[in-house]
Regions:
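Phosphate-binding glycine-rich loops and adjacent basic patches that engage nucleotide phosphates
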Residues: 10-20, 82-90, 168-173, 194-203, ...
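Helix-boundary and loop/linker segments of multi-pass membrane transporters
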Residues: 113-116
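Canonical protein kinase catalytic loop motif
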Residues: 136-138
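Catalytic-core segments of enzymes that bind and process phosphorylated/nucleotide-bearing substrates
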Residues: 141, 147-212
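Short helix/strand-capping connector loops at secondary-structure junctions
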Residues: 210-223
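Residue-level detector of conserved catalytic or cofactor/ligand-binding positions
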Residues: 220-233
């Protein structure tokens, strides 16, 4: 699996959501991207979670904006007036992650937008697998674009990788925070989702996704045993 690499050419505006301070930027392919910076929040681990979570979702046939690697030149942002943003840009020199910007998309609202029980069950199954704590009624991290449901923002997934201690034990523990999932009340076909997705999400597919993680996002070389830990989990 090959992700495209493009260069950031224009910083448009910050998207002040959560602690990661993503931004809207334009790249040299003339497309706009939501940039996830390596210098923000949980750093490169959040970017790795974004990549793995987004590409697993795509492999399961969910709609996910294209994920690209974004190269940030060291001179970029020197004229930025906001010191916090200027610091963030300086700390994020090099390789970052971007999601194709879906212009005109609306934030999913369960009161306004309806999803069928099959889709709801499949999204809940995905987030239980990813241990994604960030798809709640307060922050759905889903968009409606051209009347279709899109999944975004998986940077809070795979939280086990912030501490490798006892990851084998964590892997078999129930994911209790799934109780807060925005679509859980509608997810009445979890067994069907489980049966279907287990056939699609093979070890080979997971290996292909984790192989796409560049060493540069890890600050150190990723050993093969470490790279395989998300697969084992």
């Amino acid at each position: 699996m090959d992700l495209r690499t493009v260069n950031v050419t224009r910083y448009i505006m910050p998207l002040r959501e959560g602690g990661s301070l993503p931004a809207l930027a334009e790249a040299d392919d003339d497309f706009k991207y939501v940039v996830k910076f390596r210098g923000a929040g949980h750093g490169t681990k959040a970017l790795i979670a974004e990549l793995i979570g987004g590409e697993i979702a795509r492999a399961l046939h969910f709609r996910v904006p294209e994920i690209v690697f974004l190269q940030l030149d060291e001179a970029f942002g020197r004229t930025e007036a906001d010191e916090e943003i200027q610091d963030l840009l300086q700390w994020s020199r090099g390789l970052n992650l971007g999601l194709h910007f879906l212009s005109g998309a609306l934030t999913f609202d369960p009161i306004v937008h309806q999803v069928d029980v099959q889709t709801a069950s499949q999204v809940v199954w995905l987030d239980a697998l990813l241990t994604n704590v960030d798809r709640t009624i307060k922050n759905t991290n889903m968009l409606m674009w051209h009347k279709e449901l899109w999944l975004i923002d998986h940077g809070a997934a795979l939280y086990f990788h912030h501490s490798w201690e006892n990851w084998q034990k964590q892997a078999v523990n129930p994911f209790l925070r799934i109780k807060d999932h925005v679509l859980l009340p509608y997810a009445s076909q979890l067994e069907e989702a489980d049966n279907r997705f287990k056939q699609i999400l093979t070890e080979e597919k997971l290996q292909e996704i984790t192989d796409a993680i560049p060493d540069d996002l890890s600050l150190i070389h990723i050993s093969e045993p470490t790279r395989r830990t998300p697969i084992s989990y």
